[in-house]
Amino acid sequence: MLDEIYKNQKAFSDKALEVLKRDFTTLRTGKVNINIVDHINVDYYGSPTALNQVATVLATDASTISISPWEKTMLKAISSAIQAANIGVNPNNDGDSVKLFFPPMTTEDRQKNAKEARSMGEKAKVAIRNIRKDANDDIKKIEKDKSVSEDEIKKGYDEVQKITDSYISKIDQLVKDKEAELLKV
């Protein structure tokens, strides 16, 4: 019974780490990352569609993203969607593709993104702590049933805390690494 609780706690905690890593891809570093446009939806024949479903998105160099739609009629809709997404650049429509030129990041931009990374890390820690609470609640249910000895219950609480501490330290390391990447000139 307790092993199942640990397994669930680890599975949910792994998902929380994956969400944090995915969120980190939306933060701009010194070089462009095509994931910065992943959340943008384009009006495709009346329905919102992910940008990467209607166009090829490539990083042509360290400061430029090129978006080549599969249908040239989508150029205007893509430009509008990018402007509406407010990602800090204006789209440049050259008739065949939309280019996004990212200016060099200022120290202020880097510090702002590092602060955002810390905030994302804190949200992930809250998620891990909520997962711990759920695991502890499950152990309390087993404790009420008296189907497991008190020593096993104590070990259960200790193991849940060890798992939580492990994931919190992983999050701290991810945030530290991301901050270093963001602040590197």
Curated annotation (Swiss-Prot):
<dbReference type="InterPro" id="IPR023584">
    <property type="entry name" value="Ribosome_recyc_fac_dom"/>
</dbReference>
<comment type="function">
    <text>Responsible for the release of ribosomes from messenger RNA at the termination of protein biosynthesis. May increase the efficiency of translation by recycling ribosomes from one round of translation to another.</text>
</comment>
<dbReference type="GO" id="GO:0002184">
    <property type="term" value="P:cytoplasmic translational termination"/>
</dbReference>
<keyword id="KW-0963">Cytoplasm</keyword>
<dbReference type="Pfam" id="PF01765">
    <property type="entry name" value="RRF"/>
</dbReference>
<dbReference type="InterPro" id="IPR002661">
    <property type="entry name" value="Ribosome_recyc_fac"/>
</dbReference>
<dbReference type="GO" id="GO:0043023">
    <property type="term" value="F:ribosomal large subunit binding"/>
</dbReference>
<keyword id="KW-0648">Protein biosynthesis</keyword>
<dbReference type="GO" id="GO:0005829">
    <property type="term" value="C:cytosol"/>
</dbReference>
<dbReference type="InterPro" id="IPR036191">
    <property type="entry name" value="RRF_sf"/>
</dbReference>
<protein>
    <recommendedName>
        <fullName>Ribosome-recycling factor</fullName>
    </recommendedName>
</protein>
<comment type="similarity">
    <text>Belongs to the RRF family.</text>
</comment>
